[in-house]
Amino acid sequence: MPVVSLAQMMESGVHFGHQTRRWNPKMSPYIYTSRNGVHIIDLVQTAQLMDNAYNYMRSHAEQGKKFLFVGTKRQAAGIIAQEASRCGSHYINQRWLGGMLTNWATIKTRVDRLKDLERREETGALDLLPKKEASMLRREMTKLQKYLGGIKTMRKVPDIVVIVDQRREYNAVQECQKLNIPIVSMLDTNCDPDVVDIPIPANDDAIRSIKLIVGKLADAIYEGRHGQLDAEDDYEDYDGSEYDDDYEETEYTDAVIPDEETEE
């Protein structure tokens, strides 16, 4: 029995690609046809490749491998956070900071700073400081939580990275390639399948499509670590309203956390 059925994928809109004028010719093998100027993804291939991805994730989870989920677009942010947390994995769902993996030693110092501030908040140590200083430290903590909260327990670079929207997360892709970290990625019709290791042709813009694919990948990790799921989870719908779509084609080479004022 396939991990995802054709009916599930049709219902979730997994088959809808981009407008034909916005395609990447390298995705041609995964495209079934076009309708009204929109490419339609071949769901038979998606089902087969999803089985491959599921088995790959489950097998590596059984071996104790660590996973990082990456998806910073508004539609994906909430799903990435919940599904990664559910299966005990790390995630980035706001902005990818340059050097997140290739300069992990520097990033880890910021993660350690976050944990220190949270500890001081929990113990009441911040309340003992002058009001202005405590306020500044709390603002710093909030900013660090926004960008690094999903990797707070990550001790080293991940073994496998799962990506939603390979084009958007190109900086993450490049860092994975430099470090030879395998990439499992949803690929819409405007993506490049050559830069990922485990492709999953699918609509990476629709919330229901993202939820279906990412949810199944999280299932694979969970089952690899804890055994077969007892029942299918009823995943909450997301509208993405709590996440800002503030992506910029900017690389923060010094792993600097961007100021809130500069995000608009």
From Swiss-Prot:
One of its GO terms (molecular function) is structural constituent of ribosome. Gene3D superfamilies: Glucose-6-phosphate isomerase like protein, domain 1 (3.40.50.10490), Helix hairpin bin (1.10.287.610). Residues 228-264 are annotated as: Disordered. InterPro entries: Ribosomal_uS2, Ribosomal_uS2_bac/mit/plastid, Ribosomal_uS2_CS, Ribosomal_uS2_flav_dom_sf. CDD domains: RPS2. Residues 230-264 have a biased composition (Acidic residues). It comes from the Bacteria. Disulfide bonds: none annotated. Keywords: Ribonucleoprotein, Ribosomal protein. GO terms for cellular component: cytosolic small ribosomal subunit. GO terms for biological process: translation. PANTHER family: 30S RIBOSOMAL PROTEIN S2 PROKARYOTIC AND ORGANELLAR, SMALL RIBOSOMAL SUBUNIT PROTEIN US2M. Belongs to the universal ribosomal protein uS2 family. This is Small ribosomal subunit protein uS2. It comes from Nostoc punctiforme (strain ATCC 29133 / PCC 73102). The gene is rpsB.
